[in-house]
Every structure is written in C-alpha cells, then in structure tokens.
Design a protein with these regions (language model features):
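Transmembrane alpha-helix signature in integral membrane proteins
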Residues: 102-116, 197-231, 239
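Interhelical loop and adjacent transmembrane-helix boundary motif
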Residues: 67-107, 137-141, 167-198, 359, ...
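Cytoplasmic-entry segments and transmembrane alpha-helices of multi-pass inner-membrane transporters
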Residues: 26, 40, 138-147, 224-263, ...
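Transmembrane alpha-helices
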Residues: 3-22, 34-65, 146-154, 246, ...
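N-terminal signal-anchor/first transmembrane alpha helix
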Residues: 103-110, 133-162, 237-244, 250
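C-terminal transmembrane helix and the adjacent membrane-cytosol boundary/short C-terminal tail
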Residues: 8, 12-26, 30, 37-39, ...
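Membrane-interfacial helix termini and adjacent extracytoplasmic/periplasmic loops
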Residues: 1-2, 37-38, 70-76, 129-134, ...
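A structural signal for multi-pass alpha-helical bundles of membrane permease subunits
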Residues: 5, 13-16, 23, 54-64, ...
Length: 423
C-alpha cells in the first residue's frame, strides 16, 4: 500500500537527477571499458544518490506520519499510540512522552543520513549532450510498458475504479446517495454536482478554506527565508532555515501535540486574566479556532513551499541583482519588480503543493480541528472507520481530483525543462 502511494517521492527526484546528468560522463565510463549496466551502477547511480536518498527520506517521513491507513488496517504504530493515548485515554503527559520518543528516533535517522554523506560530493560537467536512446526490440518493448504502467494501474486506476463501482453499487442497492439525499446513481456529471447534498459541500468548503489560507502564507514565509539567505548567506540564516523547514520530517501527530499544549496554556492564561480584570471569557481564542490548524500546517508544510521557492530563486543569476542596484533599485524593489515575476512558475508550484498537502492532511486536522469543523480527509476517515466505504467514495474521489493538480504541474515543468535542454 505505502509503496504504491509513496513511490513518486523517489521517482520524481531520481528522474530529475538522471535527466540532468551529462551523457559525457557515461560516455567516459564506456571508454574505460564499462558496460552500460556497469556505467549505471558505478557512475549514474552514485551521482543520483543524494536525490534518491532525499526521496527515500520523504517516503519514510510520510510513512511515519500516516494515521488513516495504519488505523484502517489495525497496524499498531507510534502515531496510533499517540492518538489513542491523547484522544482515547486523555493522557496528555503519556502522549507527549511518546511524541518525544518518536521525534528522537526521527532525529537519529536524519543525523545518520547526513553523516553517511559526509565529504561525499558529486559533480558533473556543464557540457550536456542528449543521451542516446536505446531502442527496445520485440517483447522487451511490451515488458517495459507493462512494468512502467504497473504502478499507475495498481496505485491509481484500480482504486479509482473501485471507488466508482462503490458509488454505483450503493446507489443501485439502496436507491439513496452515498453521502446524503442526492440522486446521482445514473446522473450525468452536471446532475451529479447539482445533486450532491449540502454536508459534502460543507466539508469541501472547510478543506478549501484551510488550504487557501495556509498556502499563500507558506509561500510568503518561504520567499522571506529564501530571499534573506540570498542577501545574507550566513550560518545563522542557514540554521534558521533548517529549523523552520524541519517540520516536514516530524509526524503530524507530534506537531499537533507540540502546538496544542502551548496554545492551550496561553488560552487558559488569557481567559483567566480577562475574567479577573474585565469579567469577560475569551474561551479558546487560539487553540479552539482555525488559527491553531493553520499554524500547525505552516510548521508541517513550510519545507514543501520553501523547496520550490528556493529552486526558482536560485535559477535567477546574481548579475540581475547587480544590474538592478546599478539602476537605483533597493533590495525590496528588486524582489517585487524582478525576482517575483521571474519566479512566478515556482511560486505557483509551491502554492499548489502546499494546498494539496493541506487538503489531504489527517493527523493534524483530527487533533486540532475546532468543534464540528470536519474536512474531506476527516470525513473519509470517519466513514471508512465505520466500514461505510460507499459513503466515503465521493469525498475520497474529490481529494484524488485535487491531488492530480501537482502531478499535472510537475509533469508540465519536466516536459518544459527537457525541451529547453534539447534546444
């Protein structure tokens, strides 16, 4: 299950690394007597190792963060233990102890991974030529197509088909809508949307509100961090950026507990002071509103937005900065008049990635959501936990549809970069 869902993390980064490798390096290995397979193992694979390790790290972090899948299949994990201790037993101290233990394990993995790459550097020539394509013959062509298509079939086509069958089957057997009173068992796409009941749109609006709030804030913070590092590339700035983007390596349940405890104490202290001074109750001003959710989302997904923003900013040559200063522009004017227009594609990608991650985030939302503020992800989880799979199919398909956005954007960017290299 996790392999089919998380393999794109490794695939996308590895594909980019292999595509950017110069064919001159591989040709040099061939001139030294290496076969194509030996050249791949001894030259291409080591050069792509940082990207592959980064993809594996992302997949590992996502596995540790997962709650819905392991809960549905009844697999006892650390995240499950944190949820049951916090929400089921009300033991905050024990839940925080489990969170600290899990966080220590993650920190150890990060340290070991960085130590394994100590003093290892991989460079390649800037002289790039288009690699020669190997033309597969006879049955090898169909075997390659089958192997490449297998993850798509197992990880996308079959699950989507099953969800569609569940919707159709539930309508034909119960003559009711899978998520309410709408009649769309045999409806067209327009009739389907028109007959989707209000509760579904409420969950969709909640998800959309949280995502559209967190995404632009994350992009703005990422711009500030990346531009600050560009202007003052000091160790302090680098340390601040590493600290700010560490949240993606931390499971959502741990982030939720780490944010909920101080925000809750602040709310209690503020409420007590307001009661004593003005006889007014402020209630859960921060921890009981979407402010806490958005804050946790920013901690969790800032690294996603920062990566895209930093990559776009690094593609802008420093000569443009010098030219703008020679024309009398200050750093702020340079950012808004030169950098941001050139970074538009990267900014859009960053916003979309954060938007989709927030839409499908479950652990943080389950713990920190305000009362009666369920999202599509929470709705799917609750229905699936009750074995009401047909009712969970429509919101699940909605999340899948939103999740296709970054896939389309990244595919377009990869195609554009390949065309540019060929010209």
């Amino acid at each position: 299950m996790f392999v089919l869902v998380l393999y794109p993390y490794v695939y996308l980064l590895a594909r980019s690394a292999f595509s950017n490798q110069s064919s001159i390096t591989l040709e040099a290995s061939r001139s030294l007597g290496c076969t194509p397979w030996q050249g791949f193992l001894k030259v291409a694979l080591p050069m792509a190792r940082p990207a592959i390790v980064a993809g594996l790290s992302l997949a590992l972090m996502e596995t540790l963060n997962d709650y819905g899948t392991v809960e549905f299949f009844a697999v006892p994990t650390f995240t499950i233990g944190i949820f049951r201790t916090w929400l089921g037993q009300g033991e905050r101290a024990a839940a925080m102890q489990l969170a600290v233990l899990l966080l220590s394990f993650i920190a150890l993995l990060v340290i070991l991974e960085r130590q394994s790459r100590t003093r290892q550097r991989y460079y390649q020539t800037n002289q790039t030529t288009e690699s020669k394509r190997y033309q597969l013959q006879s049955w090898h062509q169909w075997a390659a197509i089958g192997i490449c298509g297998l993850p798509i079939i197992l990880g996308f086509a079959i699950p989507v088909s099953v969800l569609a069958v569940l919707i159709k089957g539930d309508r034909s057997t119960t003559n009711t809508s899978p998520i309410g009173d709408g009649d769309y068992g045999t409806a067209t796409s327009g009739e389907f949307l028109a007959n989707v009941p209000d509760p579904f749109w409420g969950y969709a609006i909640h998800s959309f509100t949280l995502a559209t709030t967190a995404a632009p804030i994350a992009v703005i913070i990422a711009i500030i961090l990346a531009y600050g590092q560009r202007l003052q590339p000091s160790k302090l700035n680098r340390w601040a950026i590493q600290s700010a983007t560490l949240g993606y390596a931390i499971p959502g349940a741990v982030i939720a507990i780490g944010a909920m405890v101080p925000l809750g104490k602040f709310d209690n202290a503020l409420d007590s002071w307001m009661r004593s001074q003005f006889n007014i109750s402020t209630g859960l001003l921060l921890s009981g509103t979407i402010f806490a959710l958005v804050f946790a989302y920013l901690v969790r997904f800032l690294a996603v937005g920062y990566g895209a923003v930093e990559s776009s900013l690094n593609n802008i040559k420093p000569n443009l900065d010098n030219a703008s200063r020679s024309l009398g522009l200050n750093t702020t004017q340079t950012l808004f008049q030169i950098h941001l227009p050139l970074m538009r594609g990267g900014l859009i990608s960053a916003a979309i990635l954060v938007f989709v991650d927030v839409m499908k985030e479950l652990p943080v939302t389950l713990i920190m959501r305000p009362l009666n503020y369920d999202t599509l992800a929470v709705r799917v989880f609750n229905l699936a936990s009750d074995e009401r799979l047909a009712e969970a199919a429509v919101p699940a398909l909605a999340i899948i549809a939103v999740g296709l956005l970054p896939v389309l954007v990244l595919s377009w960017q990869m195609g554009t970069s390949i065309v540019k290299r060929q010209h």
